[in-house]
Amino acid sequence: LMIRRPPRSTQGVSSAASDVYKRQVAGTASSRPEEDTTCFAVVDRWGNAVCQLQSIQSAWGSRLVAGDTGILLNNRMTYWHLDPNHVDCLQPGKRVRHTMNPVMMFRTESGGTDGIVGGEELVLVCGTPGADTQVQTNLQVITHLVDFGMNVAEAVEAPRWRNTHSPTESNFPHACDDLLYVENRLSPKVLAGLESKGHQLEVIGPWEASGSEVMIQIDPDEGAIKGAADPRRDGYAIGW
C-alpha cells in the first residue's frame, strides 16, 4: 500500500492515523461543517470498491424532505434552461442533466495465467466535487495517469485548468465569463501557446483551480493499492 499526504500538510500520515490525533481533531473540529459536494473513494483488501459523490446542489437543496424518511431532496432542477433551442431546455418528462461524475476505470484482459479471457480488472477509482469542472478535472488527472505515466499523487498535484462559459454553465442564470483559468505553475511557453490558439487566460494561484480529487489506483499485477488526495482542499489519502 502506498499513501500520499498533500504537499502542504505538516501532519505525518502515521500520526494522522493515531487515536491521539483523532481526539485532537475531534476537539477542534467545527460543529457546523461546510456544505457543498463531497466525494470519497474506498477499496478494500478483497477488491471491493466504492466511489461516492454526494450533492444536493445548493445548501439544504430544495429544502423539502421526502415524507418522514429524513431524506433531503436536491434542487438540481436549477440546471434547466428556458431557451427552447437549448439541449437542456425544461420539458415535460425530461430528466435534467447534472455534473455528478464518479469514475471507475477497468483494464480489459485478452487472456492470462488466471484463465480469464475478456474479463475486466478494476485499476482506478476517482472523483471530485466541482460542478461543471468535475468532468474537466477527471479528464486531466486520468490523462496524466494513462498518457503521461504519472502515479496518482503526481496526477493530483499537477498544474490544472478550468473553464466555464455562457450559455452552457449549469447554474441558473447560466451566465459567466469564458475565461480559461490556469494555475501559475504552468510554464510561460504553455500559456503563450494557449493564447496563440485564441484562449483568454486568467492566471491564478498555484493551487487555486477547481476540484478536490481523490484517487485510488489498483495494480492487479503487483497487488498494490496507491492513494492520493487533492492538496487544493482538505482531502486526505490513508490506508490500513
For the regions a protein language model found, what residue spans apply to each?
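Compositionally biased, intrinsically disordered/low-complexity regions enriched for serine, proline
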Residues: 3-4, 30, 228
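Feature targets compositionally biased, intrinsically disordered low-complexity regions
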Residues: 11, 26, 110-118, 222, ...
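Cofactor-centric catalytic regions
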Residues: 15-22, 34-35, 181-240
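Proteins synthesized as precursors that undergo proteolytic processing into mature forms
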Residues: 26-207
